[in-house]
């Protein structure tokens, strides 16, 4: 079972207003960047693997010509796999963002899977239980077991926290 602290490995870049819930695991070479005036808030038990980039960037409002801040909220029990990229994208609970998947200015609801190398178009909402496949194909997983997913994430965090050279822990 994982501890209640977030584990941040060495060689991780965390900048700006970033908050973590309990039991998160941030692998080496991940980048979590909240630009000035923006923020990123993680829930509990999120796994962020190597090379993942999660950014909150201010956006230019064409009407006012002002830059507006962005607040990203990432729920609980999400797994961001190697090289995935999210920018100004909110994520609900129990999702798998697979290898080198990309989402910009989007919204990912709960219990979804983004397959490897997929890209959500800007402004798109990935609906609950969706499985997003290459070539913009979409199917739905109505048999997703949230309890099993949560248990698997907790077990994985428990294993990983002993495998990495942890630079810091945060309560």
At which residue positions do the language-model features occur?
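Extended, small-residue-rich solenoid/repeat segments and analogous flexible loops
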Residues: 1-25, 31
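Generic signal for short, ordered secondary-structure residues
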Residues: 3, 25-26, 74, 91
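Short amphipathic alpha-helical segments enriched in hydrophobics
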Residues: 27-28, 50
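Glycine-rich hexapeptide-repeat left-handed beta-helix
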Residues: 35, 39-171
């Amino acid at each position: 079972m994982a501890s209640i602290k977030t584990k941040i490995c060495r060689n991780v870049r965390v900048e700006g207003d970033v908050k973590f819930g309990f039991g998160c695991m941030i692998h080496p070479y991940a980048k979590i960047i909240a630009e000035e005036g923006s923020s990123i808030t993680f829930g509990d038990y999120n796994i962020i693997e190597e090379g993942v980039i999660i950014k909150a960037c201010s956006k230019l409002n064409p009407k006012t010509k002002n830059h507006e801040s962005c607040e990203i909220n990432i729920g609980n029990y999400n797994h961001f796999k190697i090289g995935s990229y999210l920018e100004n994208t909110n994520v609900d609970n129990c999702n798998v963002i697979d290898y080198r998947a990309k989402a910009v200015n989007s919204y990912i609801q709960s219990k979804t899977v983004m397959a490897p190398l997929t890209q959500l178009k800007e402004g798109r909402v990935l609906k609950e239980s969706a499985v997003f496949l290459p070539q913009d194909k979409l199917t739905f997983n109505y048999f997703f077991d949230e309890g099993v997913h949560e248990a698997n994430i907790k077990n994985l965090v428990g294993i990983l926290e002993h495998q990495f050279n942890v630079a810091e822990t945060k309560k």
